[in-house]
């Protein structure tokens, strides 16, 4: 199937989806309605671009016809030639855009995510920077209309985070934040530094797609569940009922502790969400390593230890080392305005995939 047949098939399906979504039987079936709505939304940009492309093709035909029928009118012929030139340039632009839109989509792109941030090298300063990153992602999520929920947090004595886990829910969350996994380095003068020297610290970020139970089934025999008395949030009934939950996946020794909620059941549900995502991510990493993973050939390994970005406070500079992007607007980015960085990473990834496809 050539590119034009693919595009026509996408448009035909889009029109079919429009009819289905107005069918009373579909509207009354919430699950099916949501699935079809999501499919329609995922094809919308492609269909809009394809329809605009077809109009450009018609503009070329019209301009060529005008040149033939100019009847010696030099001004009319000149105008038609300019229109033809512009339309042909537009045609090339649309063809590149449509190739990108037809690239195979990451099946996880529409998913919610589990976001883990940890203070790494640098002690208290690293923990404080982990808090800065948490705020950055939280503000970005708010701007996108996403829901941001802190599920688990371990703080240090100066208000930073040893580790914090959040759930980010909304439209296409993973597609935009999947490039954030890795080591984020900060260069700044810590508040505790009396000599004014710049210190370098690191916080690590891991972005994992949310994994539903039906998608990834963990054998209950592989889990050890411990119930104990909460020492933090949920402490109002700490002396009456043991509400905190620790779940260990025995084959990998991956563990999650949850005590943020006031009931054992809610803590258990949240802990299972996190451990399901971590275990699935663990085995996905192994599989990708064995296959010379896509993320190694495009934008890094996605590994927590790979340095991906530097935030330099004295120079108000952010550098993404994977794509050589440098922006002198650190304050803007840390305030949650991540679009310029995210868009550059998405474009780079798409370009790399397109080059691979054309080889």
Swiss-Prot record:
Residue numbers of N5-methylglutamine PTMs: 236
SMART domains tied to this protein: PCRF
Disulfide bridge partners, by residue number: none
Subcellular location: Cytoplasm
Modification after translation, per record: Methylated by PrmC. Methylation increases the termination efficiency of RF1.
Major localization class: cytoplasm
Keyword terms of this UniProt record: Cytoplasm, Methylation, Protein biosynthesis
Pfam family, one: PCRF
Annotated GO MF terms: translation release factor activity, codon specific
Alphabetical list of SUPFAM superfamilies matching this protein: Release factor
Keyword Protein biosynthesis on entry: yes
InterPro entries named in the record: PCRF (IPR005139), Pep_chain_release_fac_I (IPR000352), Pep_chain_release_fac_I_sf (IPR045853), Prokaryotic/Mito_RF (IPR050057), RF-1 (IPR004373)
GO (cellular component) term, any one: cytoplasm
Family: Belongs to the prokaryotic/mitochondrial release factor family.
Role noted for this protein: Peptide chain release factor 1 directs the termination of translation in response to the peptide chain termination codons UAG and UAA.
HAMAP family: Rel_fac_1
Official protein name in the record: Peptide chain release factor 1
Naturally occurring in which organism (per UniProt): Streptococcus pneumoniae serotype 2 (strain D39 / NCTC 7466)
């Amino acid at each position: 199937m050539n590119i034009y047949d693919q595009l026509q098939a996408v448009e035909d399906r889009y029109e079919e989806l429009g009819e289905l979504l107005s069918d009373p039987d579909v509207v009354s079936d919430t699950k099916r309605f949501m699935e079809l709505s999501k499919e329609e939304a995922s094809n919308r940009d492609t269909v809009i671009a394809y329809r605009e492309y077809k109009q450009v093709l018609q503009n070329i035909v019209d301009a060529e016809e005008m040149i033939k029928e100019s009847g010696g009118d030099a001004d009319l012929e000149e105008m038609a030639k300019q229109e033809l030139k512009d339309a042909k340039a537009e045609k090339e632009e649309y063809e590149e855009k449509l190739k990108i839109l037809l690239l195979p989509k990451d099946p996880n792109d529409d998913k919610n995510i589990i976001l883990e941030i940890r203070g790494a090298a640098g002690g208290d300063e690293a923990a404080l920077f982990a808090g800065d990153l948490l705020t950055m992602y939280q503000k970005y999520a708010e701007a996108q209309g996403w829901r941001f929920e802190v599920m688990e947090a371990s703080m240090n004595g100066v208000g930073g985070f040893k580790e914090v886990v959040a759930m980010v829910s909304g439209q296409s969350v993973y597609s935009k934040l999947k490039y954030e996994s890795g080591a984020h380095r900060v260069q700044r003068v810590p508040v505790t530094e009396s000599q004014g020297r710049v210190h370098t610290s690191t916080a690590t970020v891991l972005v994992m797609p949310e994994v539903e139970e039906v998608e990834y089934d963990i054998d209950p025999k592989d889990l050890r569940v411990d119930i104990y008395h909460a020492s933090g949030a949920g402490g109002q009934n700490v002396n009456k009922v043991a509400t905190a939950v620790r779940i260990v996946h025995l084959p990998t020794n991956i563990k999650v502790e949850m005590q943020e909620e006031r009931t054992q059941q809610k803590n258990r549900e949240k802990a299972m969400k996190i451990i399901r995502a971590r275990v699935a991510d663990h085995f996905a990493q192994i599989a990708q390593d064995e296959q010379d993973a896509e993320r190694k050939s495009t934008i890094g390994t996605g590994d927590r230890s790979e340095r991906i970005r530097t935030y330099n406070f004295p120079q108000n500079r952010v550098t993404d080392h994977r794509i050589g992007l440098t922006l002198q607007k650190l304050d803007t980015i840390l305030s949650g305005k991540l679009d310029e960085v995210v868009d550059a990473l998405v474009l780079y990834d798409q370009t790399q995939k397109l080059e691979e496809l054309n080889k």
